[in-house]
Every structure is written in structure tokens, then in C-alpha cells.
């Protein structure tokens, strides 16, 4: 039974999702240092270019080869500019489930890229990898992330009280950790009936070696 994700590229009408590479270092560092990323994710701060190189060269490959997950750069098809990141984590190969999360660069918000990339990834997981469940967790006050989950057809399953550590600006400009709730969403193959039809017609899955 497959227990690691392949090196994959996924294309939609506007985006290409692919493995991170050295050319992404500067844009990845800039994206990860954004205040919204700091507030709602566990990405260590400050996140400099050295941290970006370690993420690309060590963390992301290790997650994939160990079977825990997959990191995909989200890039614009026409410009090849990095506009986000899709992550799979906590993968259970027996249950065929994984946890999906997404980050959108501040220069690319409001374009619908997060939902397009998340839907493309979900479609690939269900059709190509034969997964049966995708889980998403969002901080209770992270309404933008919740809107993405709802837009791609996720079903809200409930609240994990006090399970999330977010960060908030203090009066002196520093960041303080704040405990809050997680809202848990799930997506099953049947949830994409209708909602994923447009992508199913336009999406393409290729090995990264073929695409590169």
C-alpha cells in the first residue's frame, strides 16, 4: 500500500501546484513573515531566508518521504509567482485521511486562490490517491480560512475547545500566544459531487519530473 505522496504537480485554470524549490526562498520568507500568517499559524517567527531554505531543503522533503504529508507551492500559471502554500499533514494511510491547510500570500489575497488550490488538492486526493477523508481545522476567529473551507464544500463537524494556540499583537508590538478554539471541518468524496465538477473538467495531475 502506498505510504508516501508522489512528487506531483497539479494544474488548474489559473494555478500550478508543485513542490517548493530554491527559487521560492525569498517569496516564501516574505509570505511567512506576514502578520496574518503569524497570527493564525504555528510558523516560527521571525521567518528569514535561512528558515525558508531549511523548509524547502529539509522539512518539506522529510514530511513527504516519511509519509506524514506534503507541501505544495501554489503559483500563478501565467507569471509563475508564488501566491500561497498548501500543506497536507497528519496523514493516516490506513484510514486514507489527511489534514489540509493553506496559506495565501498577502499580495494574492482576495483572488480566490486558496479555495481553487484547496479544491484542486482535494480532487487529486480523492481521485488519484483514493483518499476517503480530508480534515481542516481553523482557529475560531479566522473567518477567512473558514470561508475557504465552506466554499469548497466542507462540512462543519464541531468545535475543539481550547485546542488552538493563536498569536495576537501586544501593546508593545510583540506577539503573545492566545488560547482559542478550533473549528473542525471535513470533506468526503461525496461532498464534491457538483462542487468539484468544474475542476474535474479542467484539472490535470502530472508527476513533477514530467512537469519540470
Per-region residue spans from a language model:
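Acyl-donor (CoA/ACP) binding surface of acyl/acetyltransferases
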Residues: 1-35, 75-212
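Conserved GNAT-fold acetyl-CoA-binding loop/helix
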Residues: 36-58, 70-72
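A generic secondary-structure signal
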Residues: 58-62, 124
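Short loop/turn motifs at secondary-structure junctions and domain boundaries
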Residues: 62-68
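A generic structural signal for short beta-strands and their flanking turns/coil linkers
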Residues: 68-70, 96
Amino acid at each position: 500500500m502506498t505510504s508516501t505522496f508522489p512528487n506531483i504537480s497539479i494544474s488548474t485554470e489559473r494555478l500550478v501546484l508543485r513542490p517548493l524549490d530554491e527559487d521560492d526562498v525569498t517569496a516564501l520568507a516574505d509570505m511567512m513573515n506576514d502578520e496574518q500568517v503569524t497570527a493564525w499559524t504555528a510558523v516560527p517567527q521571525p521567518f528569514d531566508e535561512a528558515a525558508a531554505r531549511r523548509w524547502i531543503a529539509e522539512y518539506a522533503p522529510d514530511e513527504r518521504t516519511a509519509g506524514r504529508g506534503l507541501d505544495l507551492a501554489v503559483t500563478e500559471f501565467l507569471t509563475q509567482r508564488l501566491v500561497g502554500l498548501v500543506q497536507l499533514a497528519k496523514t493516516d494511510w490506513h484510514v486514507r485521511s489527511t489534514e489540509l491547510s493553506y496559506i495565501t500570500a498577502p499580495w494574492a489575497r482576495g483572488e480566490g486562490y486558496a479555495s481553487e488550490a484547496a479544491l484542486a488538492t482535494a480532487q487529486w486526493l480523492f481521485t488519484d490517491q483514493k483518499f476517503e477523508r480530508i480534515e481542516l481545522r481553523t482557529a475560531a476567529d479566522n473567518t477567512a480560512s473558514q470561508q475557504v473551507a465552506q466554499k469548497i464544500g466542507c462540512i462543519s463537524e464541531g468545535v475543539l475547545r481550547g485546542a488552538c494556540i493563536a498569536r495576537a499583537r501586544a501593546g508593545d508590538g510583540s506577539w503573545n500566544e492566545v488560547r482559542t478554539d478550533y473549528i473542525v471541518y471535513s470533506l468526503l468524496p461525496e461532498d464534491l459531487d457538483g462542487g468539484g465538477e468544474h475542476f474535474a473538467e479542467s484539472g490535470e495531475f502530472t508527476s513533477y519530473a514530467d512537469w519540470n
